[in-house]
Amino acid sequence: MSNVNLRPIQHSAVNYGRFGLVRYALAVVMAGVLFVASTGGFLYANLITQFANRVVNIDAYSIDGQTKATPDSFDGRAVNILVVGTDSRSGASGELGAGDEDEVPGLRNDSTMVIHVSADRSRVQIVSIPRDTLVDIPACKHRDGTISEPTSDDMFNNAMVYGANGGDAPEDVGPGIACVKSTVEKLADMTIDAFMVVDFAGFVRMIDALGGVWFNIPERIDDDSAQLYIDAGCWKLSGTHALAYMRSRKAQGDGSDISRIGRQQQLISAMLRELQAKDYVTDSGALLTFLQAAIQAVNVSPNLGDASADASLLINVLQKVDRSNIQFVTMPVAEPSWDPNRRIPSEPMARNVWNALKNDQALPVGTTFTDGNGAQLVVPDPTVATAPPAPTPSTTPSATPSATPTATANPSDDSNANPADNTEQSASVENNAANEAAAQQNAATCPPKDK
């Protein structure tokens, strides 16, 4: 990847389009497939055939029912979808700046999230799992039939490595994702119904096929590791630039994976706004180009490969769910006393989040999340009165955000919670208001009205 040394846009002519993130690959691909499905015809049949060719069947890698069979249809029930961005250090992904395959061999689950779609299709909850979380990884079957030893307190992003047995070939994706799926099911104590895998190279192709995305970079970035050098401001990010921003870690915020996940969630929210606003009806050529790139960028479970079978789920998720009812949350974690560079699930908060998904319920009171509008908020306590809403901030930036905070419960009220954990996982009322105002401001001013 060449160094990125850009200047903020000056309302001049710029090629414009839309942007997708590895963590939102499922919705990006399915949005176009659904539109084509609604129009019917040869184009739909051709794309469905291409999509079916990207199916990965993991039944052969089941150990004692680890890879549980799920119903043929998603209709009428809650659904949990695993989305994994792979961190391969070889081939095209390595050329894009992922690293040297001799340094970090094999496939890794660099970005992992679980998308929960409620049974009534009114709510989408997306839980990201930090890659440096220490978890139990079960025994996993390799494609040669051998089985790995189960491990405890292991790095979460080693799950794909163990399943793929250190391999990096296309044939290793199946056993790799099977191991990640089993690990997540063990961690969350719930069934994963479907999965999707995206790699770095595919991520870049998808974004470039869309034309890029407008995004407001909050501060100057100088990151040698990600090869990203960019001023603060409203930018049209290409696939290469967006990938660099996605990978950038130590040069932003506190340098943690948690803060990076938060920035990625902001990018996903920007994608949601752009995707829902795009008019594919008037630009079917652009849609076809994007879909062909997107389909080649992913591998999916058999039930997602049959788009027509589960169209009702996808249509509701992408076309009907209000952005305020889409919630991105990072699994609550804490720093273990024996290793400041790792994380462990923060209990009981982490278990409460997973139980909410398992039982198809709202996120627990006090949970920090980013909504589909890009605002970072806290789940309010319904028993606490809320203040009346303040006027929406104007498009002119002001020194003091005008949004009024929502009263929320303090997660530390739980007698079993560790107060130190709340520092990392809960937002103050002031931050809630500031972030909501910032999200509204960003949506109102980036991209500029003349773009």
Where are the regions that the model predicts?
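Non-catalytic, solvent-exposed segments at the cell envelope interface
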Residues: 2-451
